[in-house]
Curated annotation (Swiss-Prot):
This is Glyceraldehyde-3-phosphate dehydrogenase 1. One of its GO terms (molecular function) is glyceraldehyde-3-phosphate dehydrogenase (NAD+) (phosphorylating) activity. D-glyceraldehyde 3-phosphate binds at residues 150-152, 181, 198, 211-212, 234. GO terms for cellular component: cytoplasm.
Length: 336
């Protein structure tokens, strides 16, 4: 029997997760909840500027959608605790609104009858933060609410883990060269949160911004908690981003070849490896959570320490979504 999934929040991540779930055997989206009307949601599901047209058939019907012949119920309920998850026998809610980002708030879905909640954002409080194929083995099935971290943390985590496991990570700085997102203005205008830089035209500027990925990494890899810091530079591309990580290593005399070999050996469905001279548009639609770029590895000795700089690509939309769906499937499997 398929795992019944509900998506709360049908924005960029919610819609792309819906698409991705259609390709995963054993998962079925049976309901979505969003305050936008069904006609608009169906249109945005079918057509996507960056990720291309949805290959399935989408039709608006009474009470929701029909997608590839299967009914998906639609709701417009602002209070998650009032959603009919019990009646629909929902196994996992994929929480994509950005509002239910701590355990207490996300608990509203459990009160409504869902068995599990996966938050598509960094979460506050005492929650497990999961980057699939980095620390998903921490899950034991007893969890009711789990965080899927951020797109940048999913890019950073496997790289940082290899450096720490193989060479010893002393400390470091990371920068995400990140595509602009919906929380930036397309034209210069006051920003809704008062951010002067995000108030500027996203497609015309390199915009310094903050990122919580360097700090959040400690929730994924406790051994390096507090060892990383960093920031973001939002750039004029709609999707396709790059994480650069510069670290001091414990091990001495490390070579570029050794670093690249370690990354290649660690590659899997979530963590790719390439020696091709790619650019950001080449990773749009990619399902690796992180793609290590061996051509950008640099090594330098500083006194008796080894300084290493590495880089990994990610589609901040689809890479992250693919990771979320892997975690969702694993979380559901543990509950059977």
């Amino acid at each position: 029997m398929a795992v019944k999934v509900a998506i709360n929040g049908f924005g960029r991540i919610g819609r792309l997760a819906f698409r991705r779930i259609q390709e995963v055997e054993g998962l079925e989206v049976v309901a979505v909840n969003d305050l936008t009307d069904d006609d608009m949601l169906a249109h945005l599901l079918k057509y996507d500027t960056m990720q291309g047209r949805f290959t399935g058939e989408v039709e608006v019907v009474d009470g929701g959608f029909r997608v590839n012949g299967k009914e998906v119920k639609s709701f417009s309920e602002p209070d998650a605790s009032k959603l009919p998850w019990k009646d629909l026998n929902i196994d996992v809610v994929l929480e994509c609104t950005g509002f239910y980002t701590d355990k207490d708030k996300a608990q509203a879905h459990i009160e409504a009858g869902a068995k599990k909640v996966l938050i598509s954002a960094p979460a506050t409080g005492d929650l497990k933060t999961i980057v699939f194929n980095t620390n998903h083995q921490e899950l034991d099935g007893s969890e009711t609410v789990v965080s899927g971290a951020s797109c940048t943390t999913n890019s950073l985590a496997p790289v940082a883990k290899v450096l720490n496991d193989d060479f010893g990570l002393v400390e470091g700085l990371m920068t995400t060269i990140h595509a602009y997102t919906g929380d930036q203005n397309t034209q210069d205008a006051p920003h809704r949160k008062g951010d002067k830089r995000r108030a500027r035209a996203a497609a015309e500027n390199i915009i310094p911004n903050s990122t919580g990925a360097a700090k959040a990494i400690g929730k994924v890899i406790p051994e390096i908690d507090g060892k990383l810091d960093g920031g973001a530079q939002r750039v004029p591309v709609a999707t396709g981003s790059l994480t650069e990580l510069t670290v001091v290593l414990e091990k001495q005399d490390v070579t570029v070849e050794q670093v690249n070999e370690a990354m290649k050996n660690a590659s899997n469905e979530s963590f790719g490896y390439t020696e091709d001279e790619i650019v950001s548009s080449d990773v749009v639609g990619m399902t690796y959570g992180s793609l290590f770029d061996a051509t950008q590895t640099r090594v330098m000795s500083v006194g008796d320490r080894q300084l290493v700089k590495v880089a990994a690509w990610y589609d901040n939309e689809m890479s992250y979504t693919a990771q979320l769906v892997r975690t969702l499937a694993y979380l559901a499997e543990l509950s059977k």
